[in-house]
Amino acid sequence: MLLSKRVTAVLSASLLTLACQATQAADSLNFVSWGGTTQDAQKEAWAVPFSKSTNIKVVQDGPTDYGKLKAMVESGNVQWDVVDVEADFALRAASEGLLEPLDFNTVKKDRIDPRFVSDHGVGSFFFSFVLGYNEGKLGANKPVDWTSLFDTKTYPGKRALYKWPSPGVLELALLADGVAPDELYPLDLDRAFKKLDTIKKDIVWWGGGAQSQQLLASGEASLGQFWNGRVYALQQDGAPVGVSWKQNLVMADFLVIPKGAKNKDAAMKFLANASSPEGQADFANLTAYAPVNLDSVPKLKADLAPNLPTAYAQDQVTLDFAYWAKNGQAIAARWNEWLVK
């Protein structure tokens, strides 16, 4: 009888613990992004209103780390519930079985731009690599398109380029070399690196948004490849910088749920909120990055809308996320070898 009571007590305690854990799981989720102003805006636009409407606490974590995400999934100890990742990684991770499939009864995809939704991820936001330039350094010579980067006589000074092996730099080199936008893929790597060789000594590399802004605003770089939102922020601060949207290169971040996430249902609801017309518009209005939801456009601030990629659709070149998902790792090896030559 005593043993029976002890067993009952142990079982009761175990059930209580499980119930508490289930309650905790339902009441919180871990959101992971890149930090800085982007994650601050995601918190303000998505996490705070989501918590108010659902009573689900959103715990901020980061920065996004692809190796860590993979290790969590493979070990079966997944601590993250929603992760902001680059679009090409989202596709590659899905092919490797690292992500949960989305529930499209919860996440409404009918009004999501089809470029920015897949079976395992929905767009967080999209942005463009644009040609930014320092007006004080270049004077009346206003760069028009990516060919200007390679014309060091007309446009003297350093060129700022994104240093990571990801979509963007190789494409702009090929466009500047005369490749038509609809003939970019598969990338002619020999041709792209040969073109970059012509200005390699004039390149200053940036790895994050704040660094890119400093290079441009200070004039250390006369012109270069920049995230559109960072150039817009400089303009709002009165910096003497201009921008060309010709052949702006469209890239995106996706929101994904790691395979085995402990709070999958709450995470799915978070994705639905973040990708809604209101969620996307609120984030865009804070950052000058574009919404993936087509119904968000009328909700944008009147003075902001002309400064978003959505206003320059006719000049867009959408980077091929699927191509990079398949070939990115091989390209990265060659990229890193070229950098140190």
Where are the predicted features?
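Sec/Tat signal peptide C-region and signal peptidase I cleavage site
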Residues: C20-A25
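Early extracytoplasmic/lumenal segment of secretory-pathway proteins
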Residues: A26-A93
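Extracytoplasmic ligand-binding site segments that recognize negatively charged/polar headgroups
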Residues: G36-A41, V78-W80, D84-A217
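A ligand-binding cleft/hinge motif common to bilobed small-molecule-binding domains
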Residues: D88-A94, A217, S222-P240
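Periplasmic-binding protein-like
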Residues: F127-F129, L189-T198, Q235-A261, S296
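A bilobed periplasmic-binding-protein/Venus flytrap-type ligand-binding module shared by bacterial periplasmic
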Residues: V130-K137, L174-G178, A252-A266, D282-N285
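Mature extracytoplasmic/periplasmic domains
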Residues: P258-T318
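Conserved C-terminal helix/tail region of periplasmic/extracytoplasmic solute-binding proteins
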Residues: A313-K341
